[in-house]
Amino acid sequence: MTRFQFHRIAAAVCLSSVLLAASVQAADPIRIGVPVGLSGANSVVAPSVVQSAQLAVEEINAAGGILGRKVELEVADDGSGAVGAQKAFDSLIFQKKVNVLISMETSAARNAGLPILARGKVPYIYTSFYEGRSCSPWMYVNAWVPEQQVPPIVDHFMKDKAAKTFFLVGSDYAFGRGMLEFTKKYAEGKGAKVVGEEYLPMDGSDWTAVISKIRAAKPDALITSTAGGAPNVTLTKQLRAAGINIPYGNLAVDEGTAKAMGADAQGIYISASYVTGIDSPKNRQFLAAMGKKFGADLKTPNDLSVPQYEAVYAYKAAVEKAGSTDAAKVVSALSTVSVEGPRGTIAMSKERHAPLTMYLGQVQADGGVKVISSFKDVDPGAQCPNLK
């Protein structure tokens, strides 16, 4: 063999190795991590969140994936709390090697996971409504904050129900206290008076003492902010059993949870960025696809599961704009992309948060939500001014 032939063969072998490596890399799936409360306070709503993510991934793969790569879901139960979230984040980021985290979680779970997120340097799209002002260079939020959700309920109670006094009830953690802190400030700024404010632990289920205080205070209206679906169920059931029938706004009930609550949920006022009754081609298409995929096992799409569906598409758009799954490039691209989803056009363009159309509604006997009024493109306000 001549030296020339040797070099040609060596070059061919090297080229083949490079092409093979590139082919293998291109075939590697993109992994989306979903840490979510399949147990604990969020167990009522978490299955609907997983279903929405499953549909989005199925649709994307059927259309060719992302940059030609198949997408896979990795779901981890965070137990709806801090300890479980630390385990779930660590497992997904460092063992499963996910490219992104996309999920709805309690604020306790989110806050516990953020330091692990920073260490792993993985993009995170948080899809749960929350108390606001949680900021990380790696996190975006496509759900509502108090500035978007609270005013429609308080304004309606004061204007249409002549409410002058409010009683506030929440779970004793970041979401419960953060939401009601904003509610109190907003209501008092409008001239109302808060005559009581009570909290139970996240896993609290006996509201007897709180209900006694509500009776004694005789408020014109009640607003609650509890942790996930389970506390909503117990609190509302006990309120109804006690005969508390004043105007009742719940800052943590979604349409899916309302259906699970049965007759007890009837009459509750909610403020949400999604209701199944949104009359748009995208929403009708989404609901039809969910029904076709899950049939009798379908969990009612809601204000926690629909942002999950849209977030998967937002990640797809960011990766395609960045031209790769490189974490820093994707994080940079996320603020510049928008998606057309069941809620309309969603862009996380305002300090890592999204302007949203909000719907004030009241739960009906069948668990559905009757829309009273809507508010287009409500600004999230100043959430993370140091992050653009």
Where are the model-predicted features located?
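Extracytosolic ligand-binding ectodomains
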Residues: 2-5, 9-16, 26-388
